[in-house]
From Swiss-Prot:
InterPro entries the record matches: bHLH_dom (IPR011598), DNA-bd_prot-inh (IPR026052), HLH_DNA-bd_sf (IPR036638)
Domain bHLH: 28-80
SUPFAM superfamilies per UniProt: HLH, helix-loop-helix DNA-binding domain
Cellular component GO terms, alphabetical: cytoplasm; nucleus
Gene3D superfamilies xrefs: Helix-loop-helix DNA-binding domain
Subunit details: Homodimer, and heterodimer with other HLH proteins. Interacts with COPS5 and COPS7A. Interacts with IFI204. Interacts with GATA4 and NKX2-5. Interacts with ANKRD2; both proteins cooperate in myoblast differentiation. Interacts with CLOCK and BMAL1.
Keyword list, A-Z: Biological rhythms, Myogenesis, Nucleus, Repressor, Transcription, Transcription regulation
Protein name per UniProt: DNA-binding protein inhibitor ID-3
Gene field: ID3
UniProt source species: Bos taurus
Amino acid sequence: MKALSPVRGCYEAVCCLSERSLAIARGRGKSPAAEEPLSLLDDMNHCYSRLRELVPGVPRGTQLSQVEILQRVIDYILDLQVVLAEPAPGPPDGPHLPIQTAELAPELVISNDQRSFCH
């Protein structure tokens, strides 16, 4: 078994600490109670960024306020509800026939001749 240097062991232990703990240990951070509002603000900003990415129709190059982002999200949810509330289109005037594999991808269908080579 190899002996570990004390410096390397300390380095590995420090790397495992969270950023907040490391900042407090170095003395440049504030108390956890003082940092909590900042981390909540970062979390909220991250959430608004994710909403902006996920909702279609939000322009990429323009700056939107948080209220505008929320309004676009609400509009998108309402649009989805309308689409889901519409009745599904019914089958055509004939009987409903299941789709066969041969209709989807005929090249995947194995004939009896080819099947005999498999065994």
